[in-house]
């Protein structure tokens, strides 16, 4: 008996199925099915994952989708060929795009005119009141391509429905087919299916009634059960349909957009012309010979692989951005390409790193290249809309990201669906830290008096939470991956509306795109590019010599001296706790040191035990030894320690005689060596190749283990070098133009590790004067005060802008600035009338103390604002008089509290300065006093919790940053202490820490022994930390 399952929903019919696509494919293969149709509801979101699994298992896969039409029809459409697939994908796109996100609207007329080649299975059901006209329309429209689907799931009246369908089939001359009805791969998933139904319906499971599946018969069934459920003729019809279907996703062929090539030339000729033009700009004195050879090699491979259109497409996007003065820079493996450098896609010159094109493109890999380009985060939307305008919404769309269940969301949704007490569920979810794993949930449950081992309800709850983890919840948009095609995108993959206006996304994520070999252009957002442009614009107003990244002086000793002290708050890529600790140890002195600095504080080098040997060799403590000149040529820049991915590739090439493509395949195998055994087939070749070249066996094994240790996580040198350019630029600006630098960071928030308050604290430590928000002095953004600046030193005063005020709209702020013009406001009433402000606007300004120069103090501002009548056009131009109101100014404590609540910071006293005289803070050392404590001595400190980090490389160690009135205090919390002081760690705003002080390589931190939460003393302060995984 041969059987094809025709109605199968995966968990990409979000919250309607309890099985992953792979699970359904695997189960169908085990059960001996001839073929399986994946028919997610108005979606192809799960089809690629099913396709990959089916290919591995040699199971025939049918591509289809299930729809509920507006007239009540329930149908399945299956694509028998490539044209039918394009129709189906387009039909899904139409239905999705005419409805709001997550919904769809499909009409019978759409079906008739848009699915000319698809096979249709009509699924009549109980109480399905379909007009005879519609039935006749369906039967007439699809003639030999229509079946009536029958599903037997052992429910009441099923036999009566079957008799009715028999009569209907005879009357219409339409065959019946056993369509099956599958929402899970086996019956054990029924509890999960029920809980998913409750989540979808937003109703506790106890109240769902008939909305629940009445039994567990909606699974993939063994062939002998199917034989008992369906007449043989109905099962045979499944094979008729399967035999009509010859389409595979492997038939999809991506077509690059072609309009960028002039009609009188070829793609490669046009690309060569642009590269030649770029060469002249990059090397005005003539292209170096070695660069010419690399360019010729790259262009030859690009032509052979037919990637010309891809490079032209990315070049066009970058050219648009540069024409609009939008800073952008390519990164990642693309920086290994000299062609990309000549096209101004990347900024790393061949001389700055040892470029390796195989890391970017190789024949053996036979995959489209991947070029990631960062754009200013505040202006990236201009680039996105340019792409939409140039190619149209039919030919350009963003990739999807699948939002899946994580611990907290799983606990909340499962708990609510089970009808558990809402307060308990909320507390349990909040008690989980981001670093907790599934096993930690048991501990948290036990801390609330819940025992999953003895309490059946909790046992069920825990089991369901575990099962739902990783389940897809809904589609969201990718951070910037664009699919751009010559024809309609919907011929390849369905489109749907994103939650953001003027955005469309495809139904596949980046893994699906990679599996199908589609071109993706990553248009990414980077806050530092925004900050750099704004910094340079400010600097150019008083220093004409510095106006772009290219004009920043190179290899500046003062900049490297600043970094070597760990003074890197706000600096790109080296502002984390780990990087700030590494800087004084590595002490960078040149650009390449920054390339290493950025790459070495990563999981790969740390897990590969490469950091300490490198530092010892750098300090001259450990001798550098190379096996021979070939090894030296690869490892000399990093003192014999492999740090970069490119070095792993080169070592395989020079030591084990791998080709460039083979070496890159080795790197990719290393990236997934923990997930599959693909690395094993390379190990023998690597070891044998080294033995053949005369290397000792122990050295070969040691080298392979070393590069294996970082292969999955190590940074590409090209990527690190791209980031090092921005790191150096931001460092130089911080060192020489601190006011412009910090002002730009404030105007580019949110970005980076630090809040506006922390940045301002650091700015003041660098002798920058920061002025509070004030309606007559402030623009919308913060700005550097240039008035009367006539010294050789850069200006050092920042005036905070109206954008700092929480809740004040951009339009209101711009009205204030426009109304002020060259004539400052003299009274509150004048401000209200000229800027057409509402009472709410005035109260926001008063709360931020932005009116203090008009009213005297914050209390006066609030009273006067409250007393003002709403703006009336009748009063425009009227004489304005008002009685002065004089109330006592708020206390310093109240002012600081209100500052934080309205702007997130205070320029008055630091909150710790207010508390310093009180117990127990009067016994705490300030950050500025820690130098007086000997190494290993006891230390007691307190401060605002401004950051929590728990990197995966730190073996569970948590790093806290506390801020007091004199600076930042670094706290290290071992795992044993974390559990003991868990609640304080998770929620404290104000923390007191007792521990042991450690100082090494000019880095001081405190190993926490005890921690105490004193947040209640700042309960009215709106203070938040920035927490990073």
UniProtKB/Swiss-Prot annotation:
The keyword tRNA processing does not apply. The keyword Repeat does not apply. Its main location: cytoplasm. GO terms for cellular component: cytoplasm. It comes from the Bacteria. Its EC number is 2.7.7.7. Keywords: Cytoplasm, DNA damage, DNA repair, DNA replication, DNA-directed DNA polymerase, Nucleotidyltransferase, Transferase. It is found in: Cytoplasm. InterPro entries: DNA_pol3_alpha_NTPase_dom (IPR011708), DNA_pol3_finger (IPR040982), DnaE2 (IPR023073), DnaE2/DnaE/PolC (IPR004805), DNAPol_HHH (IPR029460), NA-bd_OB_tRNA (IPR004365), PHP_dom (IPR004013), Pol/His_phosphatase_N (IPR003141). GO terms for molecular function: 3'-5' exonuclease activity; DNA-directed DNA polymerase activity; nucleic acid binding. DNA polymerase involved in damage-induced mutagenesis and translesion synthesis (TLS). It is not the major replicative DNA polymerase. PANTHER family: DNA POLYMERASE III SUBUNIT ALPHA, ERROR-PRONE DNA POLYMERASE. This is Error-prone DNA polymerase. It comes from Saccharophagus degradans (strain 2-40 / ATCC 43961 / DSM 17024). The lineage of its organism: Bacteria, Pseudomonadati, Pseudomonadota, Gammaproteobacteria, Cellvibrionales.
């Amino acid at each position: 008996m041969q059987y094809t399952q025709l109605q199968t929903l995966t968990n990409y019919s979000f919250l309607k199925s309890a099985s992953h696509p792979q699970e359904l494919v695997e189960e169908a293969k085990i059960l001996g099915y001839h073929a399986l149709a994946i028919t997610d509801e108005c979606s192809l979101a799960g089809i690629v994952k099913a396709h990959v699994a089916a290919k591995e298992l040699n199971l025939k896969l049918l591509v289809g989708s299930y729809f509920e039409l507006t007239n009540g029809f329930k149908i399945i459409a299956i694509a028998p060929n490539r044209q039918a697939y394009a129709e189906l994908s387009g039909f899904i796109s139409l239905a999705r795009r005419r409805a709001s996100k997550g919904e769809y609207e499909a009409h019978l007329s759409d079906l008739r005119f848009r699915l000319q080649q698809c096979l249709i299975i009509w699924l009549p059901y109980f109480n399905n009141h379909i007009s005879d006209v519609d039935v006749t329309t369906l039967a007439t429209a699809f003639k030999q391509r229509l079946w009536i689907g029958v599903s037997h799931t052992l429910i009441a009246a099923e036999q009566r429905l079957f008799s009715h369908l028999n009569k209907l089939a005879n009357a219409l001359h339409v065959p019946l087919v056993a369509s099956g009805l599958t929402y899970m791969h086996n019956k054990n998933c029924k509890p999960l299916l029920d809980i998913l139904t409750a989540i979808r319906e937003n109703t506790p499971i106890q109240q769902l009634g008939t909305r629940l599946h009445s039994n567990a018969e909606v699974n993939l069934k063994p062939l002998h059960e199917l034989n008992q459920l369906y007449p043989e003729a109905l099962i045979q019809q499944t094979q008729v349909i399967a035999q009509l279907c010859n389409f595979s996703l492997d038939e999809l062929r991506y077509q690059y957009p072609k309009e960028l090539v002039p009609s009188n030339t070829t793609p490669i000729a046009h690309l060569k012309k642009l590269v030649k033009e770029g060469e002249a700009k990059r090397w005005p004195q003539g292209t170096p010979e070695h660069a010419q050879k690399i360019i010729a090699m790259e262009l030859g491979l690009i032509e052979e692989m037919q990637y010309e259109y891809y490079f032209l497409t990315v070049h066009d996007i970058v050219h648009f951005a540069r024409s609009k003065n939008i800073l952008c820079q390519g990164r990642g493996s693309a920086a290994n390409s000299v062609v990309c450098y000549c096209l101004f896609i990347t900024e790393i010159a061949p001389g700055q790193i040892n470029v390796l094109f195989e890391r970017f493109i190789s024949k053996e890999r036979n995959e489209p290249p991947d070029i990631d380009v960062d754009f200013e985060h505040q202006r990236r939307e201009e680039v996105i809309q340019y792409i939409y305008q140039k190619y149209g919404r039919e030919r350009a769309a963003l990739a999807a990201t699948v939002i899946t269940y994580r611990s907290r969301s799983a606990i909340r949704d499962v708990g609510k669906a089970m009808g558990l007490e809402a307060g308990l569920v909320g507390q349990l979810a909040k008690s989980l830290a981001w670093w907790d794993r599934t096993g930690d949930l048991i501990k948290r449950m036990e801390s609330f008096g819940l025992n999953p081992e003895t309490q059946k309800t909790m046992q069920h709850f825990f089991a369901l939470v575990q099962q739902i983890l990783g389940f897809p919840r809904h589609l969201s948009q990718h951070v910037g991956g664009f699919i751009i095609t010559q024809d309609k995108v919907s011929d390849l993959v369905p489109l749907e509306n994103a939650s953001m206006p003027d955005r469309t996304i495809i139904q596949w994520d980046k893994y699906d795109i990679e599996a199908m070999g589609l071109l993706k252009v990553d248009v990414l957002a980077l806050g530092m590019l925004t900050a750099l442009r704004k910094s340079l614009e400010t600097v150019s107003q008083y220093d004409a010599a510095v106006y772009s990244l290219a004009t920043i002086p190179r290899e500046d000793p003062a900049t490297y001296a600043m970094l070597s002290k760990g003074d890197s708050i706000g600096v790109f890529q080296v502002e984390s706790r780990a990087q700030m600790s590494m800087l004084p140890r590595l002490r960078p002195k040149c650009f390449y040191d920054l390339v290493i600095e950025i790459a070495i504080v990563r999981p790969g080098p740390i897990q590969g035990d490469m950091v300490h040997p490198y530092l010892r060799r750098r300090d001259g403590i450990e001798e550098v030894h190379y096996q021979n000149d070939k090894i030296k040529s690869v490892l000399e820049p990093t003192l014999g320690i492999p740090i970069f991915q490119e070095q792993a590739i080169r070592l395989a090439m020079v030591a084990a005689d791998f080709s460039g493509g083979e070496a890159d395949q080795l790197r990719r195998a290393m990236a997934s060596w923990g997930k599959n055994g693909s690395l094993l087939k390379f190990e023998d070749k690597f070891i044998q190749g080294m033995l053949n070249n005369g290397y000792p066996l122990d050295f070969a094994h040691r080298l392979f283990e070393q590069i294996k240790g970082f292969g999955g996580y190590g940074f590409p040198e090209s990527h690190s070098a791209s980031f090092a350019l921005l790191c150096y630029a931001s460092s130089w600006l911080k060192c020489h133009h601190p006011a412009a630098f910090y002002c730009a960071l404030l105007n580019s928030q949110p970005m980076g590790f630090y809040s506006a308050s922390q940045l301002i604290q650091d700015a003041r430590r660098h002798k920058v004067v920061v002025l509070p928000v004030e309606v007559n002095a402030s623009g919308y953004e913060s700005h550097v005060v240039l008035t009367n600046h006539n010294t050789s030193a850069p200006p050092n005063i920042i005036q905070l802008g109206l954008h700092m005020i929480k809740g004040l709209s951009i339009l209101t702020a711009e009205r204030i600035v426009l109304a002020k013009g060259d004539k400052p406001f003299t009274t509150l009433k004048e401000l209200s009338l000229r800027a057409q402000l509402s009472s709410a606007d005035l109260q926001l300004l008063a709360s931020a103390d932005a009116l203090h120069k008009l009213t005297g103090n914050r209390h006066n501002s609030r009273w006067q604002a409250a007393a003002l009548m709403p703006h009336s056009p009748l009063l425009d131009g009227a004489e304005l008089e008002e009685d002065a109101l004089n109330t006592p100014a708020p206390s310093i404590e109240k002012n600081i509290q209100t500052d934080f609540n309205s702007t997130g910071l205070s320029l008055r006293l630091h909150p710790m300065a207010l508390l310093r005289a009180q117990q127990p803070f009067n016994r705490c050392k300030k950050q500025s006093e820690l130098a007086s404590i000997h190494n290993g001595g006891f230390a007691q400190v307190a401060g605002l919790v401004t950051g929590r980090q728990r990197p995966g490389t730190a073996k569970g160690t948590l790093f806290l940053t506390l801020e007091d009135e004199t600076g930042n205090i670094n706290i290290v919390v071992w795992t044993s202490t974390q559990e003991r002081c868990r609640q304080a760690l998770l929620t404290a705003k104000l923390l007191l820490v007792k521990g042991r002080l450690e100082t090494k390589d000019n880095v001081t931190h405190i190993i926490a022994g005890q921690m105490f939460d004193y947040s209640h003393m700042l309960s009215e302060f709106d203070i938040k930390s920035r927490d990073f995984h």
